[in-house]
């Protein structure tokens, strides 16, 4: 965890609040499995807090809120079955058989060269 006595403080109170909120959300994120809707929503909320300008933060929050309102509490811990294209999603790094998702399985072929 972040130690306030060993690290620099942000320049503003707002920066400190954002930093503490992100640290808290990272701890909450660890309670969700990586392939669940709850994990995706926590990552989206962290990206809302990290947005640099108001318009971008507002756009991200609107998208986050629509996803949150459209899901029930029971869906938050359920695996997500729909494909997504977010860059932080751990589902894109591995599949069921510990193969990377973008790597196709190679097939053995017989030697077809003429002797």
Curated annotation (Swiss-Prot):
Subcellular location: Host cytoplasm, Host perinuclear region
Main subcellular location: host cell
Keywords recorded for this protein, A-Z: Host cytoplasm, Host-virus interaction, Inhibition of host innate immune response by virus, Suppressor of RNA silencing, Viral immunoevasion
Residue ranges crossing the lipid bilayer per the database entry: none
One Pfam family it belongs to: Gemini_V2
InterPro entries: Gemini_V2, WCCH
Gene Ontology CC annotation, any one: host cell perinuclear region of cytoplasm
Record-level GO BP terms: negative regulation of gene silencing by regulatory ncRNA; symbiont-mediated suppression of host innate immune response
Family to which the UniProt record says this protein belongs: Belongs to the geminiviridae protein AV2/V2 family.
Protein purpose: Through its interaction with host SGS3, acts as a suppressor of RNA-mediated gene silencing, also known as post-transcriptional gene silencing (PTGS), a mechanism of plant viral defense that limits the accumulation of viral RNAs.
Subunit structure: Interacts with host SGS3.
Protein name: Protein V2
Organism per entry: Tomato yellow leaf curl Sardinia virus
Lineage: Viruses, Monodnaviria, Shotokuvirae, Cressdnaviricota, Repensiviricetes
């Amino acid at each position: 965890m972040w130690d306030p006595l060993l690290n620099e403080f942000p320049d503003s109170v707002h920066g400190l609040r954002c930093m503490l909120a992100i640290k808290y959300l990272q701890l909450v994120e660890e309670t969700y499995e990586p392939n669940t809707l709850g994990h995706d929503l926590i990552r989206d909320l962290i990206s809302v807090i990290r947005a640099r300008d108001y318009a971008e933060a507002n756009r991200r929050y609107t998208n986050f809120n629509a996803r949150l309102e459209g899901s029930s509490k029971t869906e938050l811990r359920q695996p997500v079955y729909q494909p997504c294209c977010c860059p932080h999603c751990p589902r894109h790094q591995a599949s069921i058989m510990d193969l990377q998702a973008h790597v196709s399985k190679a097939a053995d072929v017989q030697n077809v060269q003429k002797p």
